[in-house]
Amino acid sequence: MARIALVTGGTRGIGRAISLVLKEAGARVAANYAANDDAANAFKDETAIEVFKFDVGDFDACKDGISKVEADIGPIDILVNNAGITRDNPLHKMDPEHWDAVIATNLSSAFNTSRNVIDGMRERGFGRIINIGSINGQKGQFGQVNYSAAKAGLIGFTKAFALETASKGITVNAVTPGYIATEMVMAVPEEVLNTKILPLIPVGRLGEPKEVGRCVVFLASDEAGFITGSTLSANGGQYMT
């Protein structure tokens, strides 16, 4: 896979795994991050993956950031919209700023990045755009009206955008993970994990971040060229559509 890939939120959690698996598959990867310079530089030193700091929720920042990626590495063939945040609260307690922040980072970001790579993909006649959604965008989650709305919106974005790009050699798909063994999930008390979370998952375990990464690698491959507008659920059978 001699392609150039940009992974947003690509230095931590699921994004880190996606970056690593894409690199293992032969892609040249650029990993975007938002804030933690020390962690990003440590990731770069450990993995030899280039890192690029910009706010995916800001269109102009994306324009400048993607221009730098393409100047430093080359035209982007694969875009993985993975960046995401949570600001949880029931709606009756939710601050407007927390709604806006989650929508900006989890949904508007997909427009901001895609708009800045799509012209080049159309000119070259090839592109792979993979949007990382969530099981909570499919089934909803208490206290996550903002997050669930953003991730559900990402699925609609995927389907509509896929229709617009299908004739140009560009595919647009989504991956919706369930409970994945990231630092955040592994911080849950073991008793809660064993009694409240694992019983919800028919396969009886958490997903591994690299399993999500392998979904992305497949959808980014030449072999997946007949798949577009699809949502690939990676949730151990917790939610089936």
Which ranges hold each PLM region?
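Conserved glycine-rich cofactor-binding loop
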Residues: T11-R12
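The beta1-alpha1 cofactor-binding region of Rossmann-like NAD(H)/NADP(H)-dependent oxidoreductases
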Residues: F54-G65, P96, P209-E211
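Substrate-binding pocket helix/loop in short-chain dehydrogenase/reductase
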Residues: P90-L91, D95-I103, V185, I197
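Active-site helix of classical SDR
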Residues: S114, A150, T158
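Alpha-helical segment proximal to the catalytic Tyr-Lys
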Residues: D119, L163-E164, G225
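Residue(s) in the substrate-gating loop at a strand-loop-helix junction
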Residues: S134
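Short, small/polar-rich loop/turn modules that mediate ligand/substrate recognition or access, typified
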Residues: A166, T171, I227-G229, N235
